[in-house]
Amino acid sequence: MKKVLILGVNGFIGHHLSKRILETTDWHVYGMDMMSDRISELLDNESYKSRMHFFEGDITINKEWVEYHVKKCDVILPLVAIATPSTYVKQPLRVFELDFEANLPIVRSAAKYGKHLVFPSTSEVYGMCHDEEFDPENSELICGPINKPRWIYSNAKQLMDRVIWGYGMEGLNFTLFRPFNWIGAGLDSIHTPKEGSSRVVTQFFGHIVRGENISLVDGGAQKRAFTYIDDGIDALIRIIANKDGVASGKIYNIGNPTNNYSIRDLAGMMLTLAAEYPEYADGAKQVKIVETTSGAYYGAGYQDVQNRVPKITNTCEELGWAPTTNMADSLRNIFDAYRSQVAEAKALMD
């Protein structure tokens, strides 16, 4: 029976991972976050009470709680991070302070107490790599100039990867995983009308629900390999289980190369699908696709990546894993999940 510490347990990955752990294993979850709305059903479920332990707190404040639970648990997942591009551009220091500085003591505690650290790197570390597939072992990590603060997230995560690798050279048991555009219900709030305040699928979905125009940044030609959250969690469960130590000292891309679509394609797919739902059809009819520049949308410090496809050979072979959810099913699952929230999202327009 493993004890799994999830910092950021109420976040997108955290709440989906907790649910899967409680449903399919006998492991205990010890979670901290500043809110508990996404995990309220887990906390209220009588059958999980003995295995779901939650503390409302902040990793930058409740440092003694964090260290105590790093010592107590077997596997440590520090999932607290800012991961929205508009924030990279507008508040780069805030991104660095949380994503790197606040997480560094947790990494050090995992090394000190001999725990398995499962750390979320990011597909962003590859930056503007020119490879057709990004290889965790061989691809170069290429970022833009200093006057483009959008790279602060990529650089903060890359630096942490290198620090963790350094601790690994001194005995830390670690696994780095790089999510490639994981999507699903609960990614961001659809109740956020401000452009750039959430990630692309949720942003577009909120616009469709409210009948607002969808803005394509620089024409929407940028492509992304989208990965359904359930597929990502499948891989994470295997990493945490770490059968025969297979995941120790490894870096895994977790993504779905077959779901590689442009942002313009994504907008079209979502509008077409919305027309099939009575709850969304009226809003979708009012949506126009308009073009904008990255400077107008994100700010002058933005720079984009045109293609981002993961090489997942080692992930599949070593973990016995493969992504199985295509793009159409991924989007339909998201549309189904949000049906009950349509009225709330529309109310933002009133």
Which residues are covered by each model-predicted region?
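A conserved pocket-lining segment of Rossmann-fold NAD(P)-dependent short-chain dehydrogenase/reductase
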Residues: 88, 143-148, 174, 180-193, ...
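Active-site Tyr-X1-5-Lys
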Residues: 147-175, 205-210
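SDR active-site strand-loop-helix element
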Residues: 7, 32, 76-79, 117-123, ...
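Conserved cofactor-binding/catalytic machinery of classical short-chain dehydrogenase/reductase
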Residues: 61, 102-105, 116, 124, ...
